[in-house]
């Protein structure tokens, strides 16, 4: 008998970190909640990272997910922005890991492929597919929608991830 698995998907960002919670049982997906954690751009970097940490910790405490998935970041031309995004991503991985969750990582094109079938889709396509896959879905903004897509990607790939880990030793 299968158990329901609760997954938190996290779309890291220094200004806004999106989060989405879904329940999965076999192939079925059920929307639970979504939102964003924001940091105050007028504060210093350490304080902003603390805001992200505290906000995500509250999400994990409230919804008690079983597993976590975080989107991998890309390197862009602005090295400082890339480093700051990497620090926010570190918080996004640390919070669920400290709560004892297994944290998986997915490239943006893998997330899009899992949700819309191709690796290079548009935001509106993701929004539309979220509504098809989970008719009761609610999200405010792209960050929360992306986080839900990350959670769905993990739901579709969690079995293959376990197989890879088992084969790796």
Swiss-Prot record:
Its main location: cytoplasm. Mg(2+) 1 binds at residues 11, 143. Keywords: Cytoplasm, DNA damage, DNA recombination, DNA repair, DNA-binding, Endonuclease, Hydrolase, Magnesium, Metal-binding, Nuclease. GO terms for molecular function: crossover junction DNA endonuclease activity; DNA binding; magnesium ion binding. One of its GO terms (biological process) is DNA recombination. GO terms for cellular component: cytoplasm; Holliday junction resolvase complex. Its cofactor is Mg(2+). Binds 2 Mg(2+) ion per subunit. The active site is at 11, 71, 143. InterPro entries: RNaseH-like_sf (IPR012337), RNaseH_sf (IPR036397), X-over_junc_endoDNase_Mg_BS (IPR020563), X-over_junc_endoDNase_RuvC (IPR002176). It catalyses: Endonucleolytic cleavage at a junction such as a reciprocal single-stranded crossover between two homologous DNA duplexes (Holliday junction). Gene3D superfamilies: Ribonuclease H-like superfamily/Ribonuclease H. It is found in: Cytoplasm. It is an enzyme of class 3 (hydrolase). HAMAP family: RuvC. Belongs to the RuvC family. Homodimer which binds Holliday junction (HJ) DNA. The HJ becomes 2-fold symmetrical on binding to RuvC with unstacked arms; it has a different conformation from HJ DNA in complex with RuvA. In the full resolvosome a probable DNA-RuvA(4)-RuvB(12)-RuvC(2) complex forms which resolves the HJ. The RuvA-RuvB-RuvC complex processes Holliday junction (HJ) DNA during genetic recombination and DNA repair. Endonuclease that resolves HJ intermediates. Cleaves cruciform DNA by making single-stranded nicks across the HJ at symmetrical positions within the homologous arms, yielding a 5'-phosphate and a 3'-hydroxyl group; requires a central core of homology in the junction. The consensus cleavage sequence is 5'-(A/T)TT(C/G)-3'. Cleavage occurs on the 3'-side of the TT dinucleotide at the point of strand exchange. NCBIfam families: ruvC (TIGR00228). This is Crossover junction endodeoxyribonuclease RuvC. The lineage of its organism: Bacteria, Pseudomonadati, Pseudomonadota, Alphaproteobacteria, Hyphomicrobiales.
């Amino acid at each position: 008998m299968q158990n329901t698995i609760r997954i938190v998907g996290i779309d890291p960002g220094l200004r806004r970190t999106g989060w989405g919670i879904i329940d999965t049982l076999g192939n079925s997906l059920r929307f639970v909640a979504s939102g964003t954690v924001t940091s105050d751009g007028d504060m210093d970097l350490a304080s902003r990272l603390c805001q992200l940490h505290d906000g995500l910790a509250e999400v994990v405490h409230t919804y008690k997910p079983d597993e976590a998935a975080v989107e991998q970041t890309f390197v862009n031309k602005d090295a400082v922005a890339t480093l700051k995004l990497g620090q926010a991503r570190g918080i996004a991985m640390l919070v669920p890991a400290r709560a004892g969750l297994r944290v998986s990582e997915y490239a943006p094109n893998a997330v899009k492929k899992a949700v819309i079938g191709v690796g290079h889709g548009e935001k509106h396509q993701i929004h539309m597919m979220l509504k098809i896959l989970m008719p009761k879905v609610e999200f405010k903004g792209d960050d929360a929608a992306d986080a839900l897509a990350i959670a769905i990607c993990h739901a579709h790939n969690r079995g293959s991830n376990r197989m890879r880990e088992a084969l790796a030793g």
